[in-house]
């Protein structure tokens, strides 16, 4: 009897947990199950048309998917549209209009997997497919993606070609929009990582906009609907990346596709993926795109967005441009000409492409000096109380890379040597961002000045505890093993 009661209790408890899980908001359930939908063949931002095309070909034979070749880019790369569903409401999404803005393209591949697989979301999928017809144009600018650049092969910003339509990629988008007379449009982009969400220390990791359709920035019914749906997105994002949502300036741009598609009668939403801490390949933001797009499809299919007050959209802070740095060193005692100046140093890191734009390494430089109390950074260091000196160059010229193995990098750094002159020439991506600066025989020490990448020593009680090398700050006590491993892997030290 006791066994029967126990089993009955377990069944009821399990059913209760299942019901509780199914009653959780859609975005929470999607987040918990995201890894099963994430397309494993794409893990970094610099994928090409040749990487994406097999995934589009793969869904051609899948039930419920329709694939149509829309045309070709200037250099002859195919541009396709993938359609899902048969509902009366048409939704058009286009990504990578700018070739170096790939985050949403990754998310679209994940969305394809969501609809392809049998999973716990069959009811949601069925409703979306019954009420909506989704049309995806992934990688509208494949020639730009090949070079990992914003513009197309003609050097044109496609988002300024909505009126003249001089480029085939722009013509394709306009023709599709007109032929569908789409009810909704999602304009999917990336933005720079130095935007903040308002005057705050938080990155604008996702920025949104219901673009204006005229210079007066009037709000008609369609634009209001777009604002309401953005309110739904905002609530989802606040649950996952709180305070990291920004709003784009809504000044009317007469040449832009988003503004014009809004004007042509499609409820248009701009989504921009910015920066997020410790997410250089934007995999967190890829997931956020996945969540807010599927939540949007669900909301449109139910009509629930109509209950969202406009004040939610209006409460989203505007982007603060140029507000962030990668690293800010605060209250640095900068020595110069026998005097000491207390200054903040704002350092940014820039990607330098190589291997046909499929890889990159980082170069850093000081981008601002002075009182940076109104700026913020992904990483900050309070240098107050530290004595600051310029890093020294190791006095001996090393002829061959293999000779570096005889040097102890930690001992060098503790003695103030941040640079080694090497006669043998190494590829720049090998030496970039290392805890030691590897330079040529005749290189000069970089000063603390705008546009330069100085090496600095931070001392307390005569002991060097931190070093700044190649734009990165290193703690010699806590990160000794990381430093050793990095130099061993790259240089054999």
Give residue spans per PLM region:
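C-terminal accessory segments enriched in acidic
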Residues: 19-46, 180, 209-219, 223-493
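Short glycine- and acidic-rich boundary segments immediately preceding or forming the N-terminal edge
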Residues: 21-78
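Well-ordered alpha-helical segments embedded in enzymatic catalytic cores
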Residues: 51, 55, 169-172, 229, ...
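Surface-exposed patches in mature extracellular/periplasmic domains of secreted proteins
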Residues: 67-71, 120-125, 244-250
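Acidic/His- and Gly-rich active-site-bordering loop/insert found
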Residues: 74-97
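Short beta-strand/turn micro-motifs at beta-sheet edges
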Residues: 76, 145, 257-260
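Active-site/substrate-binding loop(s) of hydrolase catalytic cores
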Residues: 88-90, 97, 102-243, 262
């Amino acid at each position: 009897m006791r066994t029967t009661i126990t089993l009955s209790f377990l069944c009821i408890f399990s059913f209760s947990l299942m019901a509780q899980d199914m009653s959780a908001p859609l975005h929470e359930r999607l987040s918990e199950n995201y890894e099963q939908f994430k397309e494993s063949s794409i893990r970094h931002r610099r994928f090409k048309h040749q990487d994406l095309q097999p995934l589009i070909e793969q869904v051609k034979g899948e039930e419920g998917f329709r694939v149509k070749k829309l045309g070709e880019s200037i250099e002859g790369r195919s541009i396709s549209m993938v359609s899902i569903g048969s509902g009366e409401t048409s939704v058009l999404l286009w990504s990578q209009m700018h070739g170096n803005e790939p985050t949403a393209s990754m998310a679209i591949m994940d969305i394809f997997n969501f609809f392809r697989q049998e999973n716990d979301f069959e009811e949601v999928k069925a409703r979306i497919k019954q009420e909506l017809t989704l049309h995806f144009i992934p990688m509208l600018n494949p020639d730009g993606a090949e070079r990992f650049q914003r513009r197309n092969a003609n050097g044109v910003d496609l988002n300024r070609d909505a009126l003249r339509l001089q480029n085939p990629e722009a013509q394709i988008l306009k023709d599709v929009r007109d032929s569908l007379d789409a009810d909704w449009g999602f304009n999917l982009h990336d933005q720079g990582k130095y935007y903040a969400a308002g005057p705050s220390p938080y990155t604008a990791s996702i920025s949104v906009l219901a673009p204006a359709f005229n210079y007066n920035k009037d709000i008609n019914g369609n634009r209001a609907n777009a604002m309401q749906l953005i309110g739904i997105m905002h609530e989802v994002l606040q649950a996952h990346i709180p305070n990291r949502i920004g709003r784009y300036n809504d000044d009317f741009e007469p040449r832009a596709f988003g503004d014009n598609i809004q004007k042509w009668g499609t409820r248009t939403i701009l989504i921009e993926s910015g920066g997020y801490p410790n997410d250089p390949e934007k995999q967190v933001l890829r997931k956020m795109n996945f969540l807010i797009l599927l939540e949007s499809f669900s909301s449109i299919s139910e009509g629930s967005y109509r209950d969202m007050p406009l004040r939610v959209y209006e409460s989203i802070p505007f982007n603060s441009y140029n507000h962030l740095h990668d690293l800010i060193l605060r209250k640095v005692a900068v020595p110069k000409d026998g005097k000491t100046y207390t200054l903040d140093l704002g350092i940014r890191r820039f990607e330098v492409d190589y291997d046909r734009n499929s890889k990159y390494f980082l170069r850093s430089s000081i981008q601002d000096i002075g009182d940076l109390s109104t700026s913020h950074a992904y990483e900050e260091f309070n240098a107050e109380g530290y004595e600051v000196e310029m890093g020294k160059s190791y006095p001996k010229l090393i002829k061959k890379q293999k000779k570096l193995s005889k040097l102890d990098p930690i001992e060098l750094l503790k003695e103030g040597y941040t640079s080694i002159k090497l006669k043998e020439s190494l590829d720049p991506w090998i030496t970039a961002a290392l805890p030691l600066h590897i330079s040529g025989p005749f290189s000069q020490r970089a000063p603390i000045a705008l546009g330069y990448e100085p090496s600095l020593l931070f001392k307390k009680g005569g002991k060097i505890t931190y070093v700044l090398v190649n734009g990165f700050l290193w703690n010699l006590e806590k990160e000794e093993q990381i430093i050793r491993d990095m130099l061993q892997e790259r240089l054999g030290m």
